[in-house]
Amino acid sequence: MREKGRESLYQDYLEIIGLFRSYLKRKIKTEKNQGYQKQGINRGEKNSQVLLGNLYHSIENCQKCSLYKLRNNLVFGAGNPDAELMLIGEAPGREEDLQGKPFVGAAGRLLTEALGRVGLSRADVYIANILKCRPPGNRNPQPEEIKVCFPYLERQIEIIKPKLICTMGNFASQLLLKTSQGITRIRGKIQWYKENTSVIPIFHPAACIYKPGWERDFLEDLKMVRDELKKRNNSKNNLVV
């Protein structure tokens, strides 16, 4: 009888432990979902900052083209991971390669100043390039380099889901818009990339350094970018009942 009593108590003990474990699992799951809701993250989904981090770690040691042999740092992108406006250039320069951040050289300083002059801030946008590694001598990107690197940029766009993309210069504009027309012909014209994302091509800020006469057009195009973004936001607000 004693053995049976002990066995019965042991079975009761195991049942209690099992129930307690089930309770803990439910509690942890509930608290995790509540945490997601507080952060504005849908259940079962990861936020854009986490997804961008995952993408960075998946490509930080990329060796798909020869540029990796010359780089000091991979220049992934920087800015607000939930930005409504995304700026895209062509490739990192010397300062970008040294610091691992996009648009931190002379062209970057001009861009930051110009954004401020039209009421925009770098803190609110996301900036990336077609290439993540610096081409030697700041030469133009080669077709094979663009081919292997462009999917990374596409994934960044997919994660960030910007309302508006501003392509800076020939390479970014021609690539995203699938056109052979030069930037002087297509700049300042609203076009479409995918779904609800519009694109406005503008001069690359580096071009304005070498051709100061273009800076006025550069600023006017950024004003257009600002106004289009406001228009998109106002349109969305008017749909809310």
Model regions: which residues?
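A polyanion-binding, active-site-adjacent surface
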Residues: 18-28, 33-241
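Non-catalytic accessory regions outside enzyme or core folds
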Residues: 1-29
